[in-house]
């Protein structure tokens, strides 16, 4: 998987490559999909959410430029896989999941696999985690329509945020750098992530399209008919 999906796709950061190779992705997917765990594809993990494809995880991780002294906030724990990849690369990971069942499951998995520098909780990621701010880096694995101001406020001066931003069905991955209190944006690539819910969804101007009910989680290839348990 690593040679094809990560190195073969242009990832060059040796620490990121090593972390991807060392992280057991099969531990973060449903048992009935473990035979697909090392394919470069997103997979459903329940509750209308997905685990991102390995290339996307490695791409976002490399864009984050993780350093061993970094305190990182992740928004959208999901299965816990992204937090697990970050764990050996940074000092500490704080991760928030809004879906209670997913958050509890991810926390149990991370604890069982002894990712001891990862602290997970259930909550609305739009609001960040003020108690542990400021953060050196923030990585967002769900898509808001606009960058949440609480996350900007909780990023330290000189810090970096990787985030997909846009409408529900069309987004762009950005890396944002905080300079003099303002965010400088660099567009990285088009992308498609599950939408950020909670406060972000309540304030979304472009609402779900009732004519496309199968497009329920931001992934065009997944429908409830394909995966009835999601």
Where are these regions (language model features)?
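Extracytoplasmic/secreted proteins and extracellular or luminal domains
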Residues: 131, 169, 181, 212-213
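Extracellular and organelle-lumenal recognition/adhesion modules and their flexible linkers in secreted
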Residues: 205-230
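Conserved nucleotide-cofactor-binding alpha/beta core module
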Residues: 65-174
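Conserved class I S-adenosyl-L-methionine
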Residues: 165-192
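Short, solvent-exposed loop/turn elements at domain surfaces
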Residues: 28-30, 196-197, 224-230
């Amino acid at each position: 998987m690593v040679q094809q999906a990560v190195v073969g796709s242009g990832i060059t950061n040796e620490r990121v490559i090593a972390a991807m190779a060392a992280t057991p992705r099969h531990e973060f997917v449903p048992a009935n999909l473990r035979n697909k765990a090392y394919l470069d594809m997103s997979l459903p993990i329940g509750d209308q959410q997905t685990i991102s494809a390995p290339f996307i995880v490695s791409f976002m991780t490399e864009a984050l430029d993780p350093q061993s002294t970094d305190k990182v906030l992740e928004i959208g724990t999901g299965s816990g896989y992204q937090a697990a990849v970050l764990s050996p690369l940074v000092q500490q990971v704080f991760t928030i999941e809004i879906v209670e069942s997913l958050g509890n499951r991810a926390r149990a998995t991370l604890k069982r696999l002894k990712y001891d520098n990862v602290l997970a909780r259930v909550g609305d990621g739009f609001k960040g985690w003020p108690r542990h701010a400021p953060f050196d880096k923030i990585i967002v694995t769900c898509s808001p329509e606009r960058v949440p101001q609480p996350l900007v406020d909780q990023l330290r001066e000189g810090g970096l945020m990787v985030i997909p931003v846009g409408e529900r069905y069309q987004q762009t991955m950005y890396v944002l750098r905080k300079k003099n209190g303002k965010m400088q944006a660099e567009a990285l690539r088009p992308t498609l992530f599950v939408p950020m819910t909670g406060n972000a969804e309540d304030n979304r101007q472009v609402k779900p399209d009732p004519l496309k009910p199968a497009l329920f989680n931001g992934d065009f290839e997944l429908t409830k008919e394909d995966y009835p348990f999601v």
